[in-house]
């Protein structure tokens, strides 16, 4: 090889190496975002054949994809889900979690839907339940650490002040167990977000109905640790999913179009 050919070969080699280096810099390797989720809350999140499915799962996957990453779901009990996040056992929580002032003291939220709470009873409403006040002297199944549990506690204080019988609150670690208690006739009502209530009414062959109007609609959000840049990235990704129609498609798939964030 003469000197001219050698010089050209060197230049081409350096140029190729530069292109490879620039390409590597432009396309960083995708990372895995681990989401803690209480997979006992259909249609938001549940397990089918050992695999997590639901609206929240689809949303987590869509957000991760939007960020050039991938999502991993880690089943975690709702009563320990924020401690798990704070202990860095996951990067975020997506679990139909209501964005409340109390929770916002511990974590940041990227809101993605607005959901109210609902009471569910057996078909025919044998206990004549019409709202929280009508639960006096009756028993209600609810999942631990939920906003519904907190609302029942507040209602009991109101009933006590009025000299009325309190609600018997039966707390379950899994929401599916709370719903099963109503089906088995062990309680008069089940109290949860409107999303699982509607799901159970639609999928149980006429065994259940709602009782009274939805209560206290509020935003639900993805929780992240304070100071974690993921929180801001999630907000941007959620806005993008609404703008490009992805969120609309996901919510429609699970029968949840009515719970989209209002503009």
Report the location of each language-model feature.
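Periplasmic-binding protein-like
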Residues: 38-39, 114-121, 148-151, 194, 198, 238-255, ...
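Beta->alpha turn/N-cap motifs
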Residues: 36-41, 74-79, 88, 92-100, ...
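Flexible hinge/capping segments at coil-to-helix
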Residues: 122-140
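Short helices/loops that flank or line small-molecule/ion binding pockets
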Residues: 62-66, 74-75, 79-92, 106-107, ...
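A ligand-binding cleft/hinge motif common to bilobed small-molecule-binding domains
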Residues: 80, 97-105, 151-155, 184-216
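Extracytoplasmic small-molecule ligand-binding "clamshell" domains
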Residues: 29-96, 244, 253
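Ligand-binding cleft/hinge of the Venus flytrap
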Residues: 60-68, 148-171, 202-205
């Amino acid at each position: 090889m003469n000197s001219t050919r050698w010089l050209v070969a060197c230049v081409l080699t350096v140029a190729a190496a530069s292109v490879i280096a620039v390409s590597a810099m432009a396309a960083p390797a995708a990372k895995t975002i681990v989401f803690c989720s209480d997979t006992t809350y259909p249609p938001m999140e549940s397990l089918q054949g050992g695999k997590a499915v639901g609206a929240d799962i689809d949303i987590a996957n869509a957000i991760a994809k939007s960020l050039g990453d991938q999502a991993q779901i880690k089943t975690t009990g709702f009563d320990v889900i924020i401690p798990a996040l704070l202990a860095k056992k996951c990067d975020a929580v997506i679990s139909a979690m209501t964005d409340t002032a109390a929770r916002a003291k511990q974590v940041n939220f990227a809101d993605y839907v607005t959901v109210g709470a609902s009471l569910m009873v057996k078909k025919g409403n044998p206990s004549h339940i019409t709202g929280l006040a009508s639960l006096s002297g009756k028993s209600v199944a609810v999942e631990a650490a939920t906003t519904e549990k907190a609302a029942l506690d507040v209602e009991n204080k109101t009933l006590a002040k009025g000299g009325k019988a309190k609600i018997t609150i039966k707390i379950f670690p899994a929401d599916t167990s709370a719903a099963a208690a109503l089906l088995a006739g062990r309680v008069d009502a089940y109290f949860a977000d409107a999303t699982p209530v509607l799901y159970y009414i639609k999928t149980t062959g006429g065994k259940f109905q709602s009782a009274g109007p939805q209560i206290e609609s509020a935003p639900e959000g993805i929780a992240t640790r304070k100071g974690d840049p993921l929180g801001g990235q999630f907000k941007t990704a959620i806005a993008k999913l609404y703008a490009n129609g992805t969120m609309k498609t996901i919510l429609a798939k699970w029968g949840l179009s009515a719970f989209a964030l209002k503009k």
